[in-house]
Amino acid sequence: MTVLQYFNDLASRLNLTGSQIEGVNASRDRILTALQSSPKISLIDQKPCFYTGSYSRDTIIRPLDDIDLYIRIDYSKHADGKSPREIIMLFRQELKRTLPETPMKESPPCIKIKFFNKRFEVVPVVSYRDNDDLYDIPTSDLKGWEPCFPTLPNKWLTQANKRNGGLFIPLIKMVKQWIRNNGLRTPIKSFHIELLTDLIFSKYNIENYPQGIFIWFFAVNELFLFNKMPFVPEPEGNGYVDSYLFGKPFLLKRFRNKVSDGLKMTCDAINHGSKGQETVAVNLFRSLFGAL
């Protein structure tokens, strides 16, 4: 197997299968049916729910992690005068009534529902007729609402993927697999990685996967050397998405060290590949990304 063959195979293995996607949609339909069948809950008739997060952006990898599902409530009929806490409690009550054997718990601002091999995070949201991008979601204390723009990342991600010949999204998935292989999946936020990768490849082009992975490690290593403060801006321009990382010195140091190690291993693999030692190079990349 050549290095390029290995990366093409890796990209394929990280994608969800058709049966997994069908399973996700079937579970979504069970959630939606439970809510729509309740006379106590009023949802928007057209497009009552939609995926968001890494699942909607096609940057989720196998095995499945959390799937974010936004439920569009009819504010005038249902939510007006009710606090987000009341709505969350009502959602959970109706979901539990219809899906009594399905594990679920409140985890503000969402309800986490555990199905076989997947978990949903269900969030009630309020939409606006004059702005398709703007939604209100419950605050973490469930005392009020705050604005969010869940569809905007899909737009810049699509642009970045097109700009890089369709290699951008698969590369993000590879980086996420490297993070998972290094035990960093829980502490390192998925959206942070997507924005960080976009920041890098707004200045570089991805010619192929090995070159793209090298650029990612090299650029992130350089960014950490020259930035002692958060540097990945939020899409809406309010704050930085990597603030959490710089607020945890031990995690920051651990992540920086993993990036440095990844850069060294990638350089070693590429050097072996350039000498025609494809098997050695492939084995190094396998160590980098781990078994699937």
Q: Would you name each region that the model predicts?
A:
Residues 1-12, 62-72, 139-151, 229-235:
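Short, compositionally biased low-complexity segments
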Residues 22-25, 41, 51, 63-77, ...:
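Histidine/cysteine- and/or acidic
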Residues 1-8, 36, 80, 231-292:
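Terminal (often C-terminal) interaction modules
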Residues 56-62, 113-115, 242:
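Short, solvent-exposed polar/charged micro-motifs at secondary-structure junctions
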Residues 23, 29-32, 100, 105-233, ...:
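Catalytic cores of NTP-dependent nucleotidyl/adenyl transfer enzymes across multiple folds
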Residues 1-64, 75-83:
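N-terminal regions immediately upstream of nucleotidyltransferase
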Residues 21-28, 81-85, 164-169, 210, ...:
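Generic detection of long, well-ordered alpha-helical segments
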